[in-house]
Amino acid sequence: MKLPLSPSTEPVATEPLGMALLSSILAAWSYISENPERAALYFVSGVCIGLFLTLAALVMRISCHTDCRRGPRRRCLQDRECSDSSDSEDGSEDTASDLSVRRHRRFERTLNKNVFTSAEELERAQRLEERERIIREIWMNGQPEVPGTRSLNRYY
């Protein structure tokens, strides 16, 4: 289907880009001023969706960070079944039990690591723990023991 050609050869006047932007801004302003509740709802919904997507991306990055960094070599060394057949290609298909075992091993490795590099840091940490324990005991012993049947209001 052919469209008829326009008889005039004059170029069609186009709006300048600045005027179109100004017109769009004014239209948005009038919509917001006429419907403030709806505009607020759209804004809050957009912020919530953005936060949800950011949270999902962070969770995925944190949970997959160590699994994605591992190469097939490390996987083979941990499983003690390193073969050059299609096993290295199928290594990405982990079961839930393998993942839980790997996480448990990783947790045990972090427990066995020495966090403190010097004896001074270790001594400081022990003193800090002792101080926190003493403060906690003082706090717990300083609280009045209120029986369960009595009212919590002291001034009556």
Curated annotation (Swiss-Prot):
Nucleotide-binding recorded as keyword: no
A Gene Ontology biological process term: energy reserve metabolic process
Manganese as UniProt keyword: no
Pfam families: FAM176 (PF14851)
Membrane-topology descriptor: Single-pass membrane protein
Region Disordered, annotated ranges: 79-100
Keywords (A to Z) from UniProt: Apoptosis, Autophagy, Endoplasmic reticulum, Lysosome, Membrane, Phosphoprotein, Transmembrane, Transmembrane helix
Transmembrane segments: 40-60
Compositional bias ranges of the Acidic residues kind: 84-96
Phosphothreonine PTM sites in chain numbering: 110
Modified positions (Phosphoserine) in chain numbering: 118
Any single Gene Ontology cellular-component annotation: plasma membrane
Localisation: Endoplasmic reticulum membrane; Lysosome membrane
Lineage: superkingdom: Eukaryota
Family of the protein in this entry: Belongs to the EVA1 family.
Function: Acts as a regulator of programmed cell death, mediating both autophagy and apoptosis.
Protein name in the entry: Protein eva-1 homolog A
Lineage: Eukaryota, Metazoa, Chordata, Craniata, Vertebrata
Gene: Eva1a
